[in-house]
Swiss-Prot record:
Belongs to the TmoB/XamoB family. It catalyses: toluene + NADH + O2 + H(+) = 4-methylphenol + NAD(+) + H2O. Pathway: Xenobiotic degradation; toluene degradation. Gene3D superfamilies: TmoB-like (3.10.20.270). Keywords: Aromatic hydrocarbons catabolism, Monooxygenase, NAD, Oxidoreductase. It comes from the Bacteria. This is Toluene-4-monooxygenase system, hydroxylase component subunit gamma. GO terms for molecular function: toluene 4-monooxygenase activity. GO terms for biological process: toluene catabolic process. It comes from Ectopseudomonas mendocina.
Length: 84
């Protein structure tokens, strides 16, 4: 495992959390790891596909892109949002 820390803001959560993911994790896996710390704790569960983007960007990362391929820097802020 190649640990890679990111700050994550989950849609409708009031916290930004430091979450450790793996460089080989897909964006779907990253979204799941972030959701684990938010959903059913401070955010109600919801149907839909979770997506990842750079903080305050409108462009979503491809779901199968890995952290290593994303160009993100350690501790950079990402948003996890539900796809409309």
């Amino acid at each position: 495992m190649s640990a890679f820390p990111v700050h994550a803001a989950f849609e409708k959560d009031f916290l930004v959390q430091l979450v450790v993911v793996d460089l080989n994790d897909s964006m779907d896996q990253v979204a799941e790891k972030v959701a684990y710390h938010c959903v059913n704790r401070r955010v109600a569960p919801r149907e839909g596909v979770m997506r990842v983007r750079k903080h305050r960007s409108t462009e979503l990362f491809p779901r199968d892109m890995t952290i290593a391929e994303s160009g993100l820097n350690p501790t950079e802020v990402i948003d996890v949002v539900f796809e409309e």
